[in-house]
Structures are given as structure tokens and as C-alpha cells.
């Protein structure tokens, strides 16, 4: 669940959040978002305890309200995941395009919203999708083990970046200013981040989706969800602070991905 919550957004979006809301306001907003998600986690924990089956929201809505409610709620949830899959599938290509712009700019297909799309990007994104599809088909044990090691590696990298930032040449607490966007004020600055927080924590609900495969008591689900959300919130806050005190506001506005 932690690995699903933390994706490319935690490394790409802190600069945008700081620019829109200010550093501390962004950190507060993303923390409030986690607390709101925990309320949903309470519901999931109670449902898993009563319905320890796989399927997540689909199974719960079907068992509680019948096929029609389950049909519509599950499709709306599916549409949400389709958006996330599209973003994650193109994230690696997007990162390569930013780091090595000349390498992927071959075979231009079209321009949308001022962004050029190349066939090389699509090939890379498709290859990664097929790779992870194959891993998923192999079974939960294989994919679960890989995700576990990926999460460990990500936590180590985040901690190294955060604590290493204290020794960076650009480190300065004054760079955190303004703590909140001056024109918008604290309330609006925080609410703007709270509004996008549900997207930032998408994925924590994958724990209930595999409840039937648990080798522990279902009542532990709530604790797992809460711990995952708190860990994800901590990661977001660390990346916001890391970005904030290592970059001035001017650099933030000129760089695409200041983090």
C-alpha cells in the first residue's frame, strides 16, 4: 500500500505544490489529506473484518448493496485507476525525456497541450506495461517480493536525500519562505493541497483487494492501512521540505521539476 501511494508524484510535484501554496502550507495540506484518507481506511478495516474476501470495493458493495450498486461503483473506481495507470505508464518516459531530451525525441507523432509526443516514448511506456503485466501474471508472491524490495530501496533513497540535504551547498531554511502563499493566505493554500491529496494517496486500498490471501487476522488490516498512509504522508512531507530548503523561489519557477 505504501508503494502504491508513493510514486513519481512525490518526486515531481513538490515544486509545484510549494509554488502554489508555500512550503509549510503544502506540508500541512498533504498531512491533513492523509488524516482524511485514514477515515476511509477505518471503513475498509471494518469491511475486511466482516467480509474477508478479495475484491475490495467491488466485493464489499456487491455483498452489501447488490449487483447494480456494485456495477456502478466499481466502474467509477476503475475509471480512476485507468487515469493513474496512464500517468504511471508514461512517468518513466517523461523522466528520460527530461534528463536526456535528445535521446527520445525521434518519430514525432503529434503535439497536445504544447507537449510533443514521440513514438520512442510510447514504445518505452508500452514495454514497461508489458513487463509489469507479466510480473503480475506470475502471481502475488513474485510481484509482492519485487514491490517490497522496491519500497525498501525507495525509503533508503528518500532518507539519504533528506538527511544529505543538510550538507548541500544550497541548504537554507530561509528558502522555505514564504511558508504559505502570501496572496492566498494560509487557509486557501492548505485547502488547495488537501484537494489533490486523494490522488496523492491512491493505492492504499489495495490491501482490502487481496484480503482473502492474508496469512494474518483480518482485523490487522486497519493498522496496515493507517501505517501505510502515515508513512506515505511522511515521505511527501520529507520531499516537500527537501525541495523547499534546497531551492529558492526563483529557481523553482524556472525549473520544470525543481525536486
What does each model-found stretch correspond to?
Residues 27, 103-120, 148-259:
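Helix-loop-helix junctions that connect adjacent transmembrane segments
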Residues 1, 27, 66-79, 125-126, ...:
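Select transmembrane alpha-helical segments in multipass membrane proteins
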Residues 49, 56-63, 70, 145-148, ...:
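Short amphipathic alpha-helical coupling elements at transmembrane boundaries
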Residues 1-12, 199:
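The first (N-terminal) embedded transmembrane alpha-helix
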Residues 48-49, 72, 127-153, 210-213:
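Membrane-water interface regions at transmembrane-helix termini and the short interhelical loops
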Residues 38, 45, 88, 92-95, ...:
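Transmembrane helix-loop junctions and nearby membrane-interface residues
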Residues 10-113, 228-234:
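Extracellular loop-to-transmembrane helix junctions
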Residues 33-36, 128-136, 155-165:
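Hydrophobic core segments of alpha-helical transmembrane domains in multi-pass membrane transport
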Amino acid at each position: 500500500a505504501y508503494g502504491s501511494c508513493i510514486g513519481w508524484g512525490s518526486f515531481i510535484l513538490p515544486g509545484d505544490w510549494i509554488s502554489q501554496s508555500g512550503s509549510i502550507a503544502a506540508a500541512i495540506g498533504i498531512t491533513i489529506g492523509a488524516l482524511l484518507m485514514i477515515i476511509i481506511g477505518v471503513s475498509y478495516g471494518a469491511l475486511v473484518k466482516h467480509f474477508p474476501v478479495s475484491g475490495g470495493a467491488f466485493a464489499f458493495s456487491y455483498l452489501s448493496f447488490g449487483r447494480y450498486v456494485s456495477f456502478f461503483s466499481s466502474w467509477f473506481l476503475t475509471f480512476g485507476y485507468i487515469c493513474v495507470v496512464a500517468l504511471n505508464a508514461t512517468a518513466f518516459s517523461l523522466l528520460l525525456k527530461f534528463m536526456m531530451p535528445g535521446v527520445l525525441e525521434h518519430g514525432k507523432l503529434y503535439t497536445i497541450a504544447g507537449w510533443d509526443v514521440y513514438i520512442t516514448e510510447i514504445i518505452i511506456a508500452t514495454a514497461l506495461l508489458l513487463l509489469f503485466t507479466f510480473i503480475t501474471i506470475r502471481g502475488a508472491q513474485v510481484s509482492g517480493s519485487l514491490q517490497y524490495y522496491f519500497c525498501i530501496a525507495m525509503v533508503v533513497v528518500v532518507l539519504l536525500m533528506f538527511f544529505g540535504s543538510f550538507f548541500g551547498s544550497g541548504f537554507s531554511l530561509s528558502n522555505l519562505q514564504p511558508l504559505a502563499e502570501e496572496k492566498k493566505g494560509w487557509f486557501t493554500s492548505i485547502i488547495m493541497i488537501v484537494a489533490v491529496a486523494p490522488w496523492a494517496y491512491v493505492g492504499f486500498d489495495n490491501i482490502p483487494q487481496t484480503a482473502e490471501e492474508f496469512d494474518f487476522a483480518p482485523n490487522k488490516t486497519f493498522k496496515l492501512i493507517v501505517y501505510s498512509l502515515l508513512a506515505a504522508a511522511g515521505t511527501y512531507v520529507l520531499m516537500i521540505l527537501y525541495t523547499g530548503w534546497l531551492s529558492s523561489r526563483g529557481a523553482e519557477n524556472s525549473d520544470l521539476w525543481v525536486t
